[in-house]
């Protein structure tokens, strides 16, 4: 018990002793601090009066100067009285947390690399913040410091710009007691913002806030408008390019159609050549058949002449007559298949000249279309090359080259379609003209030969333009359409031979279309009737006169012995109208011959004296022993007109032989009459 009491007393005594020592130590420190504070205040007042004597008696200015001096002391690490560049840079990076203090550093130092307390005070007095009013300080507190809750406190204390340095230093009395800031973060934030404002002046955001906002809004509007404009232009450019590509594809299709038409022309040329070869073979075959028929007729004639039996002679004559009828039937069918009208030769030359002049104008139009096509292609290639560049799309969209190329493509497409349509229409039109006229117009000797043949002044025609060789077409379309298949070459060789003979004999006119009468009283044509008939060539009139003179009262003996049907076939005129007329007359004569043969069965084989006398006095009935001049002239004409020289002589000899087949034909009694109704079919018009 005593031990515990002693221990407690000893501890109490120790505590009292320790407290006494601490109190004595604190009193000594307070005395020392008071004495040092008094000394520092005296030194600060003396320095302030030395630097700024007019303001040294103001207590607020003294407090502000003391705050500026403390700021300078914070920045002066080596305590040499001056703040150099390194010290200020370190202070900005470490204390103010500026990562790029270049602008602030240049603003703080300027041209002076060493900043003293006096320099710092003069810079503060010359600052705009030094002259701030209470309202400006409150505005700075709200906008820059962002502490609007202390606005009333600042207004009550009437803190102006002179008190700003006191806010920039760590002063618990000022911030805690006077401003009543209990939050440490608010005190630190206010200190840093005030320090930045004192050292570097008013913040730029407070002065240029509205301007920057306006510039930002304008920039955003311009950017959005530019993006929208670029989008619209890009879409318009794409649509325009699509349209141009469609037009270009249409131009390619028109060009392809022109190529297809050109290939069709090539095929037509090949078919034309094939038809020409087949036509020559067909002509040769027909000539061979005609020669065989003539040989058979000659054989029957020889058999008839060497037979003494009257029935055998009559039988041979009937067989020969049947062959003649068959030949006449074929000739009639060929004549019925052709038109009865033929244009004159001069019309053919004028139409050929018209075709050549039209070809010249077509070539000019085609050359213009080719030039437009090349220009459009070059423009399209340039547009494609520009699109491959970096700003090619925008350049093409803003320039007028796209519209120009589009217009050129449409113009070239229209011109090419017009040229194609003109080519088709011209080929069809001249084919129809050839069909109606019956001669060839596209295939002609050329414009120079036609001008010379028609005696036209060459200066009227002008100079022909050469065809372009740089175009995509391989051959000249106009040279090909001159070799287009003519409808005349598809027809029978007899028509072509007749057309050829008509071209070589331009003096042949149209024959009379008057039908021959079938009456027995009209044995011969009177002079007045012959004057009413249209003028005929000598060969045509001779053949027609023979057919008409053969139909007399004793026409059976005249037909069989005087004028043989085989010879009349050779003597038929070239004009289809006169040939039909002669065939009808010959057909009617054959019917009358059979009728007279039945009426006079007792006639002698050699014929009556009246028949011989009439034969000798008739100018149209040549003597059997004398060759017919009509046959000779016909043979010479055929030899001149035929295109195959070695067949011309054979044709002439065959015609002379065929002309003498029926000269010795005699009639016999009791023979049946052959119905020849097939020769009386109506003519096709």
From Swiss-Prot:
Outcome of residue 131 to Q?
Answer: Impairs ORAI1 ARC channel currents
Comp. bias intervals (Acidic residues): 655-666
Keyword Repressor listed: no
In chain numbering, motif Microtubule tip localization signal lies across: 642-645
Region feature Required for generation of inwardly rectifying CRAC currents, mapped onto this chain: 672-685
Note down the stretches annotated as region Disordered: 490-542, 596-685
Q: What else is known?
A: Transfection of STIM1 into cells derived from a rhabdoid tumor and from a rhabdomyosarcoma that do not express detectable levels of STIM1 can induce cell death, suggesting a possible role in the control of rhabdomyosarcomas and rhabdoid tumors.
Report the protein name in the record. Answer: Stromal interaction molecule 1
Name its species: Homo sapiens (Human)
């Amino acid at each position: 018990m005593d031990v515990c009491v002693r221990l407690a007393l000893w501890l109490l005594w120790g505590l009292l002793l320790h407290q006494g020592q601490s109190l004595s130590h604190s009193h000594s420190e307070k005395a020392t601090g008071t004495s040092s504070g008094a000394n520092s205040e005296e030194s600060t007042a003396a320095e302030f009066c030395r630097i700024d004597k007019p303001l040294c008696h103001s207590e607020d200015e003294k407090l502000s100067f003391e705050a500026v001096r403390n700021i300078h002391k914070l920045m002066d690490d080596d305590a040499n009285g001056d703040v150099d560049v390194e010290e200020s840079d370190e202070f900005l990076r470490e204390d103010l947390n500026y990562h790029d203090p270049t602008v602030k550093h240049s603003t703080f130092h300027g041209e002076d690399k060493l900043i003293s307390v006096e320099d710092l005070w003069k810079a503060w007095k010359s600052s705009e913040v030094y002259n701030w009013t209470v309202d400006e300080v409150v505005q700075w507190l709200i906008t820059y410091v962002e502490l609007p809750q202390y606005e009333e406190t600042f207004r009550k204390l009437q803190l102006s710009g002179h008190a700003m340095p006191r806010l920039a230093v760590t002063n618990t009395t000022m911030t805690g007691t006077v401003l009543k800031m209990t939050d440490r973060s608010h005190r630190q934030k206010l200190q840093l913002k005030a320090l930045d404002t004192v050292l570097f002046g008013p913040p730029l955001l407070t002065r240029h806030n509205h301007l920057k906002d306006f510039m930002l809004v304008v920039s955003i509007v311009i950017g959005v408008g530019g993006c929208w404009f670029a989008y619209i232009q890009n879409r318009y450019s794409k649509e325009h390019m699509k349209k141009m590509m469609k037009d270009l594809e249409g131009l390619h299709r028109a060009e392809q159609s022109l190529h297809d038409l050109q290939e069709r022309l090539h095929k037509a040329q090949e078919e034309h050549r094939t038809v020409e070869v087949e036509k020559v073979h067909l002509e040769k075959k027909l000539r061979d058949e005609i020669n065989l028929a003539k040989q058979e007729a000659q054989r029957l004639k020889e058999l008839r002449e060497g037979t003494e039996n009257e029935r055998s002679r009559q039988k041979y004559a009937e067989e020969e007559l049947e062959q003649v009828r068959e030949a006449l039937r074929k000739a009639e069918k060929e004549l019925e298949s052709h038109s009865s009208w033929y244009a004159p030769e001069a019309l053919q030359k004028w139409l050929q000249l018209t075709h050549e002049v039209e070809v010249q104008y077509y070539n000019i139009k085609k050359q213009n279309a080719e030039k437009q096509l090349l220009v459009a292609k070059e423009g399209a290639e340039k547009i494609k090359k520009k699109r491959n560049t970096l700003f090619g799309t925008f350049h093409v969209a803003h320039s007028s080259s796209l519209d120009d190329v589009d217009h050129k493509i449409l113009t070239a497409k229209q011109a090419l379609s017009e040229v194609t349509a003109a080519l088709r229409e011209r080929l069809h039109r001249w084919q129809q003209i050839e069909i109606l006229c019956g001669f060839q117009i596209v295939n002609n000797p050329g414009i120079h030969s036609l001008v010379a043949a028609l005696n036209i002044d060459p200066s009227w025609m002008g100079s022909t333009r050469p065809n372009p060789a740089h175009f995509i077409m391989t051959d000249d379309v106009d040279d090909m359409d001159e070799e287009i298949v003519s409808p005349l070459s598809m027809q029978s060789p007899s028509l072509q031979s007749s057309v050829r003979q008509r071209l070589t004999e331009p003096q042949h006119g149209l024959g009379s279309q008057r039908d021959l009468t079938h009456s027995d009283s009209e044995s011969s044509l009177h002079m007045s009737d012959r004057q009413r008939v249209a003028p005929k060539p000598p060969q045509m009139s001779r053949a027609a006169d023979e057919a008409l003179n053969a139909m007399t009262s004793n026409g059976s003996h005249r037909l069989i012995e005087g004028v043989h049907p085989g010879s009349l076939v050779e003597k038929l005129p070239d004009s289809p109208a006169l040939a039909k007329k002669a065939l009808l007359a010959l057909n009617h004569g054959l019917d009358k011959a059979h009728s007279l043969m039945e009426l006079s069965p007792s006639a002698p084989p050699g014929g009556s004296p009246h028949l011989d006398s009439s034969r000798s006095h008739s100018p149209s009935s040549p003597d059997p022993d004398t060759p017919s001049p009509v046959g000779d002239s016909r043979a010479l004409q055929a030899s001149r007109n035929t295109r195959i020289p070695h067949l011309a002589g054979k044709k002439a000899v065959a015609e002379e032989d065929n002309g003498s087949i029926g000269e010795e034909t005699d009639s016999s009694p009791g023979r049946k009459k052959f119905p020849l109704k097939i020769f009386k079919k109506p003519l096709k018009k």
